[in-house]
Amino acid sequence: MTIKSMTEYETISYKTFLDIFSPLPEIGEILEESESVEEAREKLFEFCKELEWEIRMGRIKFDNEVDRWLALKAIEVFLNIISKDNERLAGFSTLEYLWKAYKGDEEALKEIREGFIEEFRHLFLAMSGKADYSLGFLGKRLLEEGVKFIDFSKIKGREAGIARSNFLDKVYEIMREYISRYPSGLDKRIILKRKKNREILEEFFGITDEEWFNYKWQFKNVLRGLKGVKILRELREVTNFKISDEDLEIIEKAVKNGIPFGLTPYYLHLFDFENPYVEDLAVRRQVIPPEWYVEKMIEHKEDRNIAFDFMGEHDTSPIDLVTRRYVTIAIIKPYESCPQICVYCQRNWMVQDFDAKAFPGWEKVEKALDWFAEHDSMIEILITGGDPFSLSDKAIEKMLNRIAEMNHVVGVRFGTRTIVTAPMRITDELAELLGSFEKSLMISTHVESCYEITPEVAEAVKKLRTNNIYIYNQHVFHRYVSRRFENVALRIALKKVGIIPYYTFYPKGKMEHKDYLVPIARLAQEVKEEARLLPGSFRTDEPIFNVPRMGKNHLRAWQDRELIAIKPNGSRVYLMHPWEKGIYPTKLYTYEDVPIKEYLDSLKEIGENIEEYKTIWYYY
Ligand SMILES: *Cc1c(COP(=O)(O)O)cnc(C)c1O
């Protein structure tokens, strides 16, 4: 499951490079005849303006109005990329690479990767109106299935209504085929598999159902440290549970180097014991760290809390345990670990092992609560961590009682993943305690795939909802949950158990998480080509980019970001607009994305047909 490092790709041939200009040979000619980058810049600007005007005057014919719109967008992107001012912001010149490479400069050609070539191949196709984007991937599938597109200007009334309805049923057939690739934990087959796994584990641990369904037993028996590795080894020896030597060694290396690893027995039973990394790909990747991650974390063992504090939390904490980035809400972190550790955790620089030391002590917690009491701007308090449901009911009650006295606080939100990692934590007592809180109380949880949604999750959610507590989901759209319609399958499963999709996060570009990254373009594509096929009440999540220090911002479109450069390795460079835009002056944030080509290669490795993703290049 390792991703090829970029240096392993071969140097691009000059001919391959020249080929990309075939939709717009004029661009190649300008690069050829220009004596300098500056000359090329001026001439390309003139050319683009003329091309734009020809389009706007209707002198260029397009197969479809959408392809015409895309051509205008692509011209804008190209102008952005060749703009001198954007070069200043990006810190380098994309145009210089294009110009040098066109002149056959070997150094430039050596540096340029396939990802760069592909970006420009598609950009030039789009600018010339030949992208065929309007058909999308679904349109192509429909044509393959022999479905005829109906011209609704030719038929009317009931006839049109029936034709459209029949056509939409065909669309659903394709959608259903994709969704069915992702088994849900509510499927009978999976429920039976898990029942068997539970029995195997109960026998292995020498316990009864009663202990299994008791969260205290689950918490006490979290697989962690060297003991956890030993248990996984033993389990492999005496049961049908499969795990590779490689995985065991990586986990062992992680725990020996103080990198937190934690896995609840409950979550372990979600694994497919006999077929690793097929149906349970996302579940295993949730907790088993890839080698690269472990290496990077070891490299930065000493300065981890600086190197990996990607969100700049050190600079947004007015007092210990509190993080404030917004006007009316701040975070309090009363427990700095979780029963289960997510490999891609953005707080990986601070999470500790799951034990008593992760509780900072009442003195600190009370001081942090005092801070909330003193700030009447705080209308909501987000209690997270770590996982606050690691704390006892008593501790939770104590915090809530204190917050109940703060008149300005309207609501409390808990950020917890126990609903997924140890759903038995949601006892009747806890649900009633939370339900008895007189202010608004909600929970945001973190379900990554429909495979994690089980009858146990459904029961935990039901207990909370009968106590008037709403549960929202924060989904991290990482590489192993980002396939076609995978997020759609998740949204449907969430809806079945009563969890409301809230955020779909772009997995931030933290280098130790390289194997989990997904380009922004894939999120944008998912929203448009997949989520859009669901009813509005199912697609309530917003795509979000977390701007370091500043806070979360939407990833909707050009009102939130601008593509300003393409690195020779194919990474897009964006200017991200923070949420404060239009509220007070603030700096934009320059961000380098993961190359689309690298992402597509990794999808191919997990068996995807990347032809089905090819419109991704047209999401800027
Ligand atoms: C995410 C986050 C919140 C909550 O933001 P919402 O948009 O209300 O979900 C609050 N404070 C901090 C520091 C956060 O990172």
From Swiss-Prot:
Domain of life: Archaea
Chain ranges passing through the membrane: none
Keyword Iron tagged: yes
InterPro entries, per database record: Aldolase_TIM (IPR013785), Lys_aminomutase/Glu_NH3_mut (IPR003739), rSAM (IPR007197)
SUPFAM superfamilies (alphabetical): Radical SAM enzymes
Binding site for [4Fe-4S] cluster: C338, C342, C345
Cofactor: [4Fe-4S] cluster; pyridoxal 5'-phosphate
Domain annotation Radical SAM core: ranges: 324-586
MF terms in GO: 4 iron, 4 sulfur cluster binding; catalytic activity; metal ion binding
Modified residues (N6-(pyridoxal phosphate)lysine): K552
Cofactor annotation comment: Binds 1 [4Fe-4S] cluster. The cluster is coordinated with 3 cysteines and an exchangeable S-adenosyl-L-methionine.
Keywords: 4Fe-4S, Iron, Iron-sulfur, Metal-binding, Pyridoxal phosphate, S-adenosyl-L-methionine
Family: Belongs to the radical SAM superfamily. KamA family.
NCBIfam families from the UniProt entry: KamA family radical SAM protein
UniProt protein name: Uncharacterized KamA family protein MJ0634
Species this chain originates from: Methanocaldococcus jannaschii (strain ATCC 43067 / DSM 2661 / JAL-1 / JCM 10045 / NBRC 100440)
